[in-house]
Design a protein with these regions (language model features):
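Extended substrate/RNA-proximal surfaces in nucleic-acid metabolism proteins
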Residues: 2-98
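Short acidic, glycine/proline-enriched helix-loop-strand junctions
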Residues: 2-16, 112-137
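Active-site metal-binding loops of divalent metal-dependent hydrolases
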Residues: 21-22, 80, 106, 139-141
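Histidine/acidic-residue-rich catalytic or RNA/ligand-binding cores of hydrolases
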Residues: 28-33, 85-92, 112-123, 144-149
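A short, flexible low-complexity segment enriched in Lys/Arg and Gly/Pro that occurs
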Residues: 46-49, 102-123
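Structural recognition of alpha->loop->beta junctions
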Residues: 91-110, 149
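Short acidic/histidine-rich active-site segments
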Residues: 132-148
Length: 149
């Protein structure tokens, strides 16, 4: 509301997107899906926004992607090289299921000062690009310890 008021009064403000990280099963592997730019309070996302974990069908990646799309958002595979299955396999499956993109640039070493992991990020970026998917960058910084991240 505050940003809208500032914008209405002629103040230049940044564009802020809604965002949420949702756990999902992709090829039997628990992954994180970033929901970006969705309609806040959309009923399709309520099961994922209650504070408790979903089970069964709502946990499947295709259900998560469908809910995000129903809410007008983009579904992005977060940090694809952090999981027990290979990033190439997960990205292929994500593309097949209708994901909109993947997190290409990420600090896999979790350094004290954020820096993308060049070799793996370049491979992921190229694969996402070849599949026509959006490519994002993320810090994966949760909480108040943001210094350097």
């Amino acid at each position: 509301a505050w940003l809208d008021q500032q914008r209405a009064s002629g103040v230049e403000v940044p564009t802020v997107w809604s965002g949420m990280e949702i756990s999902a099963l992709l090829k039997g592997c628990l992954v994180h899906v970033l929901a970006l730019g969705f309609e806040l309070n959309h009923p399709a996302l309520q099961p994922y926004n209650r504070g408790d974990a979903v089970v069964g069908e709502p946990l499947r990646a295709e259900a998560v992607v469908r809910a995000i799309h129903d809410a007008g958002g983009l579904a992005v595979l977060a940090h694809p090289a952090r999981y027990r299955l290979g990033h190439d396999m997960l990205i292929e499956e994500a593309a097949w299921l209708g994901f909109d993109g993947g997190e290409a640039w990420y600090d896999y070493e979790m350094q004290s000062t954020w820096s993308a992991s060049p070799l793996i990020c370049e491979v992921i970026d190229r694969q996402l690009s070849n599949l026509g998917l959006l490519r994002t960058c993320g810090t994966d910084t949760h909480g108040i310890d943001l210094c350097g991240r």
